[in-house]
């Protein structure tokens, strides 16, 4: 489909328009890449392509907030570049992705960003934006963060509390990054796990002879995620900065987030479709390649209640977004860690299946309605990224990123039919209700009835504005009312004690009532010849009159006498 969106007219007729807050029957007219009209019995010019959506839902295109196309990680390069990755996204009903720029330590953030743009711009099939990773801290990094926000259209930065000696930041560095984010109105995204203890756990597992994929689950227990989640929320709260938790994987971490929100802290959180639908039992599969295919961090959890619990947290807005965290590797690439689980590249696929999997487990599973589905797959992301209502809503004036969704149709997921890269699918043979029939991106039909019709490079970079209201509006007001102020008091004018440090010479004249004694010899031994004790003179009772001498007539015990 090479036609310019300015020349394309589309009428979606007879469907139910679903936004995050309402559902109503309406037709949708699209022209020049923009939704022009929404309603019944629309007056439209001739020549429009008519799409019959009777009995179907018309929803905003999905926004996947975490993808890793053409990224090299743990000595392996993800098998999907920006063309194949965005193609898979569109086939699955996602019309915008957010990629990751992950600079190495001591390297320029701006240069890494420009390299990623050079890879993406000629390849993308849908609109995209970028998060930039903060993997080290220095004044130069802070300056480049400001440049990226003010000149390059970046409004979010990713940090890691794990990946020790690679990407992990210390608490004090996170504190500084959060201050910088708050000042420039950016969103700090954090992968929360206790990296120090994860590293120790990995060493212990290897020492016990555990080398297989189960070592990932063993060395990344959920208590380390919960501890780090609480800690980073505390750090962010101390800096009056919002916090966005990524890859939330456990019940205990979800509970920490829920408690923080109840306390009024500005906390946002996303999980992945893998964590919200699968379990960590796969790590104990007898087939090594099967187990390794599920290796991601944080790992999938053994507790079989976890996935349904996370889906419930998505439904009640404790978790705001479900992303794919798409970073697929082949079995051959995963096999780099066949003798050592710490060398298995972390990453799974999911950009193509995200929407259908969440519909099946969320809506069909009775956890959420179609409006909440739109919220967690599209609208909330648009609001947090400061794109709403241009993206994430079906209204006049919004970008024409629209999906015709069949809630009753079914499909069976398989690696043999997937568009996304990799030779394995986590959801193999999973039967899903909810299928995208038509995907419209930038006002062009790019996928219809199983046929993909889009050339590479037709997507565009979307600059993101800072200070999104949903994130910062409350904090700006709080800072006005909760500003820390010192106490205006009368100065203290009395005496001040002088601190004498051991081993140092006299720092000043001691006060009259300060007890003193001679300096001890080296090694702490007193010199008895230099004792302050004296039989006469310089004694405390010298002023009391004394007799010169006295004769003792009877010693204590009485006088003694001879026996003869």
UniProtKB/Swiss-Prot annotation:
Which GO biological process entries does UniProt record here?
axon guidance; negative regulation of dendrite morphogenesis
* A Pfam family the protein falls into: Amidohydro_1
* Record-listed Phosphothreonine modification sites: 509, 514
Q: Where in the cell is it found?
A: Cytoplasm
The keyword Hydrolase appears for this protein: no
Residues with PTM Omega-N-methylarginine: 559
Tissue-specific expression: Detected in brain.
Q: Which UniProt keywords apply?
A: Cytoplasm, Methylation, Phosphoprotein
Give the family, as the similarity comment puts it.
Belongs to the metallo-dependent hydrolases superfamily. Hydantoinase/dihydropyrimidinase family.
> What does this chain do?
Involved in the negative regulation of dendrite outgrowth.
Subunit structure, interactors included = Homotetramer, and heterotetramer with other DPYS-like proteins. Interacts with DPYSL2, DPYSL3 and DPYSL4. Interacts with SEPTIN4 isoform 4. Interacts with MAP2 and TUBB3.
Q: Please report the name of this protein according to its UniProt entry.
A: Dihydropyrimidinase-related protein 5
From what organism does this protein derive? Mus musculus (Mouse)
The opening ranks of the lineage are: Eukaryota, Metazoa, Chordata, Craniata, Vertebrata
What gene does this protein come from? Dpysl5
